[in-house]
């Protein structure tokens, strides 16, 4: 028996091209004091299992990390947090509270929306700036975002549970 895992479209997810302009950068740069810094990207739905709050906490407690890079969290699309279901509402509310507690204004970007068609561009934008993709999920059955990020030229960081173990081992572009 052969296991064929899900893949990713390499025509859509590919490394950045030199001197390419990324329109999504405008949505990110408005949050940041120093948008030239590399980005640490987390891209997931706002779900407690995705462990985004622990990422913000770790970033908030590391002055060295804050000096080296900005944090970009792409966590779904919203108009008003109060209109979301309880789970996503709690995650996003706490995310904003953590940004306040650690005084991360100017260092963390949390755009309100993105289109599915912009995801590949977001990965390439981060890769072009020397950034990294992080999947802080407590457990990840597969981890399609890791494949997409790797195909887009990003090094990846993930927890040592589930699919990321095999993906990072095969892609040889990250750490657990």
Where are these regions (language model features)?
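Conserved acidic donor-binding segment of nucleotide-sugar-dependent glycosyltransferases
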Residues: 170-171, 175-176
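Aromatic "clamp/platform" in nucleotide-sugar-dependent glycosyltransferases that forms part
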Residues: 138
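Donor-sugar nucleotide-binding helix/loop cap in glycosyltransferases
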Residues: 149
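Carbohydrate-associated surface elements
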Residues: 7
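Conserved donor-binding/catalytic core segment of Leloir-type glycosyltransferases
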Residues: 28-50, 56, 71-74
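Short glycine/serine-rich donor-binding loops of glycosyltransferases
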Residues: 143-146, 164
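Nucleotide-activated donor-binding/catalytic signature segment of Leloir-type glycosyltransferases, i.e.
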Residues: 75-127, 131-132
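Short hydrophobic beta-strand element within catalytic cores of glycosyltransferases
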Residues: 155-158, 175
């Amino acid at each position: 028996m052969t296991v064929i895992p899900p893949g990713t479209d390499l025509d859509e997810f590919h490394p950045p091209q030199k001197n390419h302009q990324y329109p999504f950068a405008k949505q990110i740069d408005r949050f940041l004091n120093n948008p030239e810094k590399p980005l640490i990207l987390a891209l997931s739905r706002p779900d407690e299992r995705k462990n985004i709050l622990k990422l913000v906490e770790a970033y908030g407690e590391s002055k060295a990390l804050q000096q080296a890079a900005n944090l970009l969290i792409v966590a779904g699309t919203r108009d008003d947090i109060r209109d979301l279901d309880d789970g996503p509402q709690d995650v996003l509310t706490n995310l904003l509270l953590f940004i306040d507690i650690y005084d991360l204004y100017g260092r963390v970007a949390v755009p309100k929306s993105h289109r599915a068609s912009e995801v590949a561009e977001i990965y390439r934008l981060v890769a072009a700036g020397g950034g990294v993709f992080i999947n802080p999920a407590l457990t990840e059955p597969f981890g399609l975002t890791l494949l997409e990020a790797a195909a887009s030229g990003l090094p990846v960081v993930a927890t040592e549970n589930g699919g990321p173990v095999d993906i990072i081992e095969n892609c040889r572009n990250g750490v657990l």
